[in-house]
């Protein structure tokens, strides 16, 4: 699942995105630069590890968010929900 989020102030939005990811339950940042975050998110059920990737793209003024399962074919909507929850927090907090 991948979505792009247009933001007005990319630098501050990416700082906010970093805070959101670091505060998300069962999620740990494993790599971070000024424009990229790779986090591992554990699912509630069975504790599978999923990848959560965020990338700031200055040329487009967007934060690209991708959540994907490492194991299995279906995810019961977990990755979509993770991206939706992130988007809600990014736009409302």
What annotation goes with each model-predicted range?
Residues 1-93:
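Ser/Thr-rich, low-complexity intrinsically disordered terminal regions
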């Amino acid at each position: 699942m991948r979505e792009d989020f247009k933001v007005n102030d990319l630098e501050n939005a990416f700082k906010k995105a970093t805070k959101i990811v670091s505060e998300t339950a069962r999620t740990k940042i494993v790599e971070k630069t000024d424009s990229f975050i790779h986090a591992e998110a554990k699912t509630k059920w069975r504790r599978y590890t999923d990848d959560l990737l965020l990338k700031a793209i200055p040329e487009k003024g967007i934060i690209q968010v991708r959540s994907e399962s490492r194991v299995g074919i279906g995810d019961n909507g977990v990755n979509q929900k993770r991206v939706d929850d992130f988007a809600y927090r990014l736009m409302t907090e």
